[in-house]
C-alpha cells in the first residue's frame, strides 16, 4: 500500500489528467473492442487524434478477460498496439481488469463477432468482464489470477500506463456483496506483482463505505 508521501510524490510528478471512459465507435462492448474479428486500429487512431485536439490526455478502458482467455498472446499484443496508438497522441491509459456493469442482456461475455452498435442506443449489448458466472464461482479465480499477473507483469513498468484500475464498479447491477471476494483477491494479486503504477478501483454508488 502506498504511503501518503508516495501518493503525493506521484501527484506532483504527473500532469492534471483529463480524459474519458473510452470505447471505440465501432464497438458495442469491450469484447468487440478487443476481439480478433473487430479490433480496429484505424478507428482508435482517428479517435485518439480527436482526443488530443480537444486537450484530453488519458483514456480509461476495460480489458475483456474472455478475449485474453481465448488467446493470451494475441491479447497482450493487441493491448500493446492500443497503448502505442494512444502514446502517439499523448494519451495515457488506465486499463481495467474487471467490470460488473451489465447494461445489456448478457452477463457472461462470449468471443467472436458482436452485435453492431445502434445509433442513439448506448451499450444495448454490453457485457461485463470476466462475467458474473466467474465472479461468483471461486473455483475459476485461479484463471483470473493468471490473467491479472501475466498482463500486469508484462506492463508493470510501462510509462504508457499511468494507473491500473483493478475492478470497475464492483457490486453493480445484480452483484451486491457477491463481488467482494474477487475484489479482495485482485488487490492481493496486484500487490504481489508490485507495479510501478498506482492501483485503484472505481467504486459503485452503493459501495462507497
State where each predicted segment sits.
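Active-site mouth of glycoside hydrolases
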Residues: 2-209
Amino acid at each position: 500500500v502506498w504511503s501518503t508521501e508516495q501518493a503525493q510524490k506521484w501527484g506532483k510528478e504527473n500532469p492534471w489528467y483529463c480524459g474519458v471512459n473510452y470505447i471505440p465507435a465501432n464497438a458495442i462492448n469491450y469484447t468487440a473492442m478487443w476481439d480478433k474479428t473487430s479490433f480496429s486500429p484505424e478507428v482508435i487512431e482517428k479517435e485518439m487524434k480527436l482526443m488530443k485536439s480537444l486537450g484530453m490526455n488519458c483514456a480509461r478502458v476495460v480489458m475483456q478477460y474472455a478475449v485474453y482467455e481465448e488467446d493470451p498472446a494475441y491479447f497482450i499484443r493487441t493491448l500493446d498496439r492500443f497503448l502505442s496508438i494512444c502514446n502517439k497522441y499523448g494519451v495515457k491509459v488506465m486499463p481495467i481488469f474487471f467490470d460488473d456493469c451489465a447494461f445489456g442482456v448478457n452477463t457472461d461475455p462470449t468471443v467472436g463477432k458482436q452485435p453492431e452498435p445502434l445509433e442513439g442506443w448506448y451499450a444495448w449489448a454490453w457485457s461485463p468482464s470476466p462475467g458474473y458466472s466467474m465472479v461468483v464461482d471461486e473455483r475459476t479465480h485461479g484463471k483470473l489470477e493468471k490473467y491479472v499477473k501475466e498482463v500486469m507483469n508484462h506492463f508493470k513498468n510501462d510509462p504508457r500506463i499511468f494507473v491500473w484500475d483493478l475492478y470497475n464498479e464492483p457490486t453493480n447491477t445484480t452483484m451486491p456483496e457477491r463481488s467482494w471476494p474477487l475484489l479482495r483477491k485482485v488487490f492481493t494479486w496486484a500487490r504481489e506483482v508490485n507495479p510501478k503504477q498506482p492501483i485503484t478501483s472505481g467504486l459503485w454508488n452503493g459501495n462507497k463505505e
